[in-house]
Each structure stands twice: as C-alpha cells, then as structure tokens.
Amino acid sequence: MKSAHDRDALFAFHYKYVIISLYINSCIRFWRDGLRPCAARVSLQRSPHRKDVAFIKAKHGKGTVQNSRHTHSGGAQRAASLWKQVLLTLLIFIALLALIGGALWQNICYNRTHYTAEFYQIHSRKLTQSCRVVFLTDVHLREYGQDNCDLVQDIRSLAPDLILLGGDLVTYGEGSSYDNMLSLCSQLNQIAPVCGVMGNHEDELYFLNGDQALVEKFTAAGVTILRNEEARYTVHDNVISILGVEGSPKDFYNYGASVFMDAAEQQTDYDLRICLAHVPTYFTEHLENYSFELGLAGHTHGGIVRLPKIGPLYSAEEGLFPDYAGGSYGLANNATLIVSRGLGDSSWVPRINNVPELSVIDID
C-alpha cells in the first residue's frame, strides 16, 4: 500500500520529470539562439583560401595580406568557439540521457517492489449493509515480502468480506512450480472466502501443458475456481452471487459461456451480483448484455506504460492507447466495470509510470 515514503518517491520521480523537461527546453533554445547563428557567421566570414591570399598579395601589397591573416585568425577563433559550444551541448545531452535513464530505472525498480491500494465506491440497489471486496489479479508469481507476508498483512488490515481473483496468478513458461501462489491463496483463505477465475496463463498451463491438477491444487489451497460457474456467499444477511466466465471473448459461444450466462440471467434471488472475467473486452463485447452490478477484470497490466496526461500505452486486445486498461468504467447495462492494473508482470517489458494495484471495492 502507498505509504508516506512511497508518496515521496513518486514525488521525486515527477520532480525529475519536470527537471528533464526544463533541460530539453534549454537545449532547444541553446541551439536555436546560439549555435545556429554562430555557425552561419563562421560560414559567411571564413578567411580566403591560400591561392586567394597569393592573388591579393600580388595585387594589393602587404597591407591586404596582413588583413587576410587577421581574418584567418578570427575565423579559427570562431571555429574553436563553435566546437566548444558543440562539445558543451554534447555533454548536456549525455547528462540528460543519464538523468532520464536513472529516473526510468528508479521507476522500474519501484514498480517491482511496491503497489498501491486503489479504492472504489459502488452503490447497490438491494444491499441492506455495505460489504468490502478485495480484488487481486495478474500476480504472475510476484512476491511482496517473504512468502507475500507484506501483501497478506495489508489485505488482512483491510478486513474484506470477500477476496476475488482475476486470474494469471502464475506465468506460463516459467517452470511448473507455483507453490508461492498456492501459499498466498491458503493465507488469503484464512482472512475471507476466496474465489476467482483462471487467466490466459492458467488456461495455457491447463489446456496446452496438460496440467489437469491445476484447478485441484487451487481448490486444495482454499480457492473456488469458477469455470462458467456461480458461487454464492452470504455477507451481513445479503446474498452475493459471483459469476465466473472462462476464457477470452472469442470463446464465448464455443466453450459454454453463453449458455451459462443465459441460464444465470433467469435467476433473481440474490441481493448483489458480481461478474468476473479475466479480459476486460469480454464485458464490452458480450457480458454487458446481462444483469449484474459490478464487473471485475485485469489482464492488461495497466497498459504496461502509462504516459502523463495520455494514459495507458498498449493492450493485446485493443492495441495502442486502449480504452480499458485500468480504472472504473460504465457499461451499457448500467453496471460498473473495474479493470485492475494487476500486481505483477509476465513479459520482459517493464512497467513504467504504472504502479501495480490492489483493488479495494466498497459496495453499499
């Protein structure tokens, strides 16, 4: 969670960003107002070539030759001055690159060891008492503290009524051991009921690698994995329905998700319905046609790189500048979709200006 120290670190990074911008503007003005006119003067006022000096000697005598030598000496001085200015610009440019590189590296390292709790407020039509949901997604074997002790302690302090998982707790292709994630799930199960869906990395392990015991392992750790299924929990005398949709948007009709959602649509005996899907575009392409009040997704890692005043840079489904890569969005069925930036990484591309997220949703 974001402490005072973390906020100071973020402030320091943004301060460096301002200093970098000032350096860039200074270099641009230096070239425009200094180097370019100086280069023009040296070009226009350079001394005559040697054969021109000889011609001037014969025609005009010593006085002219002395003037020519004087002009040649002045041109050399101006050229030397120009080279000094070029060297100074080069040194400033190198220092600027070092400053930018250092700031980026500091930001990357920060994003690998810190996360922030993002709080969301949702209003329900039928709940008689508020409830708190903690949502984790895209952990990708990341650990915060030994055996995730820091993460577990923070979640315990939040006192959630339910803990929901958005998939990709593991990473496909990084070995078959995910004991740290099973340990995390066991610890979370001691805090509140835990259920969730599989992400594309679990799907690849399950279907491509043939790890049929994957679901059983998470079940043994206390997690209810929903594969086009519903789970129900009673929280403060309110019945909360959790729908878990499997796969990606292209799988909606082929692997039973449409049949499951059609059947779930006929049920009305609940006070709150939450729909889980790993990929956020699943909601905009299919799920917003059904009745629920809150949708939860991950997968995008917050767009990997978040540009100041622009937002997320890229997601696999939407390409450059995606619309759904971190935050809260309204859907056509008047539900709220929350897309978490997730807690880890799955590729060699690091997060930049994109702090990992633990989502905390208060529903009243």
Kindly give the residue locations of the regions a language model identified.
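Active-site neighborhood of phospho(di)ester-bond hydrolases with catalytic His/Asp-centered motifs
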Residues: L136-T137, I163-D168, P193-N200, L226-N228, ...
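Beta-strand-turn-beta hairpins that frame and shape the catalytic cleft
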Residues: F119-V134, V223, E230-G244, T268-I274, ...
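Binuclear metal-dependent hydrolase catalytic cores centered on His/Asp/Glu-rich metal-binding motifs
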Residues: N209-V223, V235-A277, F283-E285, W348-R351
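Aromatic (phenylalanine/tyrosine) cluster motif
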Residues: F11-Y17, Y23, F30, F55
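N-terminal membrane-anchoring alpha-helices
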Residues: D52-K57, G61-L127
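Conserved beta-sheet core of the metallophosphoesterase superfamily
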Residues: P280-S359
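Membrane-embedded segments
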Residues: S130-E216, A220-T224
